[in-house]
């Protein structure tokens, strides 16, 4: 995958009002300016292991989103049905800069065969039950509106961890017989559900319609 623009730090000589570089004194004054232009990531050629740093505009085929500065992402999986472009899935791991442990997992999939928001929630809980150890408990909370989407919230607790899920579902057109399930999973050990980053991320997330 090709990243169009990378973050960079560059040094330049201080410029006077006449446009000439100021060389007064033995050591020129140095300004360090951060280029905050966002990376642009497209779905073309996306594959497992691809990664990038925020700020980034990410086009992951089925969804688009903006990752703010101070965070990075890694593609865990990406696939697209060659016969039906509406079918496929993408999973992204999200990290804080300098951390080796992901704070969130974002998944968009059209392979679960769910046909409603209610089924999307049931599917998420079912997968949690399969993956949890003993004494797992799932609680459905209040719906939350972020950006263009309304998310069902699920809190999962076990003897070993606590997680929160934000789940939404969309039909993307008359030819879409599967629907798209979008799920953000966060581990409470690394980040909380009310962290401003979660709102910023979900506010930016858009589902690509057919």
Q: Language model features by range: what are they?
A:
Residues 1-10:
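Sec-dependent bacterial lipoprotein signal peptides
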Residues 71, 178-210:
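Surface-exposed amphipathic alpha-helical segments
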Residues 10-32:
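Bacterial lipoprotein signal-peptidase II cleavage site
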Residues 123-173:
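Signature of long, low-cysteine stretches enriched in small and polar/charged residues
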Residues 61-118:
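Secretory pathway targeting signatures of secreted, lumenal, and periplasmic proteins
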Residues 50-57, 86-91, 145-155:
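Short, hydrophobic/aromatic-rich segments at coil-to-beta transitions
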Residues 25-69:
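N-terminal low-complexity, Pro/Thr/Ser-rich intrinsically disordered segments
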Residues 67, 117-124, 194-201:
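Stable alpha-helical elements in mature extracytoplasmic
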């Amino acid at each position: 995958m090709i990243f169009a623009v990378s973050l960079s730090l560059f040094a330049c000589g201080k410029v006077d009002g006449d446009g000439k570089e100021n060389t007064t004194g033995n050591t020129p004054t140095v300004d360090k300016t951060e280029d905050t232009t966002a990376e642009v990531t497209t779905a073309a050629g996306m594959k497992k292991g691809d990664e990038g740093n925020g700020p980034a505009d990410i086009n992951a085929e089925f969804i688009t989103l903006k990752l703010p500065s101070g965070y990075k992402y890694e593609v865990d999986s990406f696939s697209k049905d060659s016969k039906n472009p509406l079918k496929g899935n993408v999973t992204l791991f999200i990290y804080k800069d300098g951390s080796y442990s992901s704070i969130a997992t974002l998944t968009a999939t059209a392979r679960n065969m769910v046909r409603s928001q209610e089924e999307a929630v049931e599917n998420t809980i079912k997968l949690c039950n399969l993956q949890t150890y003993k004494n797992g408990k799932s609680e459905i909370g209040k719906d939350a509106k972020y950006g263009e989407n309304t998310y069902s919230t699920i809190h999962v607790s076990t003897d070993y961890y606590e997680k929160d899920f934000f789940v939404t579902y969309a039909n993307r057109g008359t030819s879409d017989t599967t629907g798209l399930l979008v799920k953000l999973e966060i581990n409470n050990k690394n980040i909380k559900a009310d962290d401003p980053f979660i709102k910023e991320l979900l506010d930016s997330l858009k589902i690509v319609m057919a």
